[in-house]
């Protein structure tokens, strides 16, 4: 019997038995140890029964045992030999190769994703460029069409304005013809020997009047023919006629200044302006730096090829063209609508 008892005492104690004995010596329960170590009661029970959880790594298991030993004041050196036998450190599986292969797959997938993204970006850029080019070509074609139409209208208007230019030149003809008549007046008295040739136009008229009054009744028809042409244009040179067109021009300028349309060009621009009566005031291309002042019957219909190339002022107020400039398109607007 004594031999059997001594054999039982010589049986080596395990880590779980040593921890349980130390816990009982301090009067602690498994619940109290679990609360202090922030572990489950089942984990404390498995440690005391020398059971290792299958889903728990050996590193964590050894860490729990060390924390338990510190709590019950057991030296760590005493438990390490037993712990090495009961819970040997298991070699980790070859995880780096798996992670490398996963990383390679991720990189391959990221490469395809980036290629697809760049393809979409290039397609969007290409479509945007094509859309802009089509709009640009359409605007250029529209401007060329409007320029052709305006040139045709100008040619028609030019053919109709030929009689007007002839009428305007007719009043100027008497003025041109009066000058030689006035120059011829001094020569007439010279032939008669009454007034010297160096006299002015006014003394020449006086001399001619004197010749007519002092001439005898038997004056020949040739002399009267020479004197009468010099006297015939005299009423046309009267000072009462020039103020009449001047007054009319002043009234016209005052009436048209109220509806004046001023355009300052910063670059070359095609422009067409039509007033309320349907008259084309201007149609063509203006150079940069030019100023165009138009007057007609309001409202005005404007067609501008490049809205950003000019500024418009109507009745002293600027006309807003910002929406056409932002849209980068031909501007069609009406100015002077009440």
UniProtKB/Swiss-Prot annotation:
Topological domains, Periplasmic: 133-338
Start and end residues of each HTH cro/C1-type domain: 19-79
Any single GO BP term: regulation of cell shape
Stretches in topological domain Cytoplasmic: 1-111
Domain of life from the UniProt record: Bacteria
Membrane disposition: Single-pass type II membrane protein
Alphabetical keyword list: Cell inner membrane, Cell membrane, Cell shape, DNA-binding, Membrane, Signal-anchor, Transmembrane, Transmembrane helix
Transmembrane segments: 112-132
Localization per record: Cell inner membrane
GO cellular component terms attached to this protein's record: plasma membrane
Compositionally biased spans, kind Polar residues: 151-163, 180-195, 210-241
GO molecular function: DNA binding
Ranges of Low complexity composition bias in the record: 196-209
DNA-binding region (UniProt annotation): 30-49
Pfam name, any one: RodZ_C
Region feature Disordered, mapped onto this chain: 151-253
PANTHER family noted in UniProt: CYTOSKELETON PROTEIN RODZ, PTHR34475
Family statement: Belongs to the RodZ family.
Record note on domains: The helix-turn-helix (HTH) motif in the cytoplasmic domain of the N-terminus is involved in the formation of spirals to maintain the rigid rod shape. As this protein is anchored in the cytoplasmic membrane, the HTH motif may contribute to protein-protein interactions to form the RodZ helix, which is localized beneath the cytoplasmic membrane. The C-terminal domain may be critical for determination of the rod shape by probably interacting with enzymes required for synthesis of the peptidoglycan layer, including PBPs in the periplasm.
Functional summary from the UniProt entry: Cytoskeletal protein that is involved in cell-shape control through regulation of the length of the long axis.
Protein name: Cytoskeleton protein RodZ
Provenance organism: Yersinia enterocolitica serotype O:8 / biotype 1B (strain NCTC 13174 / 8081)
Gene that this sequence comes from: rodZ
């Amino acid at each position: 019997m004594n031999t059997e008892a001594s054999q039982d005492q010589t049986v080596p104690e395990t880590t779980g038995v040593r921890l349980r004995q130390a816990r009982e010596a301090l009067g602690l329960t498994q619940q109290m140890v679990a609360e202090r170590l922030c572990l489950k009661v089942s984990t404390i029970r498995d440690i005391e029964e020398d059971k290792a959880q299958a889903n728990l790594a050996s590193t964590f298991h050894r860490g729990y045992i060390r924390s338990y030993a510190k709590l019950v004041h057991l030296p760590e050196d005493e438990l390490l030999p037993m712990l090495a036998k009961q819970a040997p450190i298991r070699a980790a599986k070859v995880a780096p190769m798996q992670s490398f292969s996963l990383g390679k797959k991720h990189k391959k997938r990221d490469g395809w994703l980036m290629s697809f993204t760049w393809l979409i970006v290039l397609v969007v850029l290409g479509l945007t460029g094509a859309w802009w080019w089509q709009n640009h070509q359409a605007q250029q074609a529209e401007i060329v069409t409007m320029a052709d139409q305006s040139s045709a209208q100008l040619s028609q208007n030019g053919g109709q304005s030929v009689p007007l230019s002839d009428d305007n030149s007719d009043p100027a003809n008497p003025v041109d013809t009066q000058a030689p008549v006035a120059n011829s007046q001094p020569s007439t008295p010279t032939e008669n020997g009454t007034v010297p040739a160096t006299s002015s136009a006014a003394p020449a008229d006086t001399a001619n009047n004197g010749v007519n009054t002092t001439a005898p009744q038997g004056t020949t028809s040739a002399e009267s023919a020479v004197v009468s042409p010099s006297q015939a244009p005299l009423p046309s040179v009267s000072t009462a006629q020039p103020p009449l067109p001047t007054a009319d021009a002043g009234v016209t300028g005052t009436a048209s200044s109220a509806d004046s349309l001023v355009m300052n060009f910063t670059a070359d621009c095609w422009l067409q302006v039509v007033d309320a009566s349907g008259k084309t005031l201007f149609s063509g291309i203006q150079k940069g730096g030019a100023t165009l002042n138009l007057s007609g019957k309001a409202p005005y219909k404007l067609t501008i090829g490049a809205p950003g190339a000019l500024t418009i002022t109507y009745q002293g107020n600027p006309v807003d063209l910002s929406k056409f400039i932002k849209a980068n398109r031909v501007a069609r607007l009406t100015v002077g609508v009440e």
